[in-house]
Amino acid sequence: ADPSAKPVLMDNGFEYIPATIIKSSANTQHNYLIIDKGSEDGVVRNSGVITEKGVIGIVDAVSSHYSYAISFLNTELFISARLGESGAVGPLAWDGMSSDRAILKEIPLQFKFEPGDTVYTSGYSTIFPPDIPIGVAGESKIINGATNEIDVNLFQNHKALKYVTIVANRRAAEIESIEQQEEEQPKK
């Protein structure tokens, strides 16, 4: 992403804001990023941080000119991911050890997949748009006889990052508002 490029608002409601990482950690269980774009640039809390090779993190705090993001290389961060072009969805998280590996959990046993199948963002959150390629499926194991847990080899080298794109969902507040309205409705 060219950090001098202008933000772009897409039809899907996401604004894409080119940015540069100015500080990061990569050697702990709770890694973070400091990014050179803030509220004056259109960044809001819970914006996604991506590259063309995958998910990088989620913005957790914003000042006028900078953002603090929780890195995908953080054991407390889970994202909604989809296996294959039209496959099952489950939580994806860093494995806590290798900067190029993650684990996709809760994939039903009846879902068939092959090592090498691509893992994408699911689009089932207000943070990331759908269909961002994240990595490829590797080995798997069955958990409690009920679901698959799949190793994912990430496309993005998280230790060699400089340029990223912040994705701010301009429709997130509307989506969250309608969810809250439904939750407050008396149940029939």
Predicted regions and their residues:
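A secondary-structure micro-motif
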Residues: 2-188
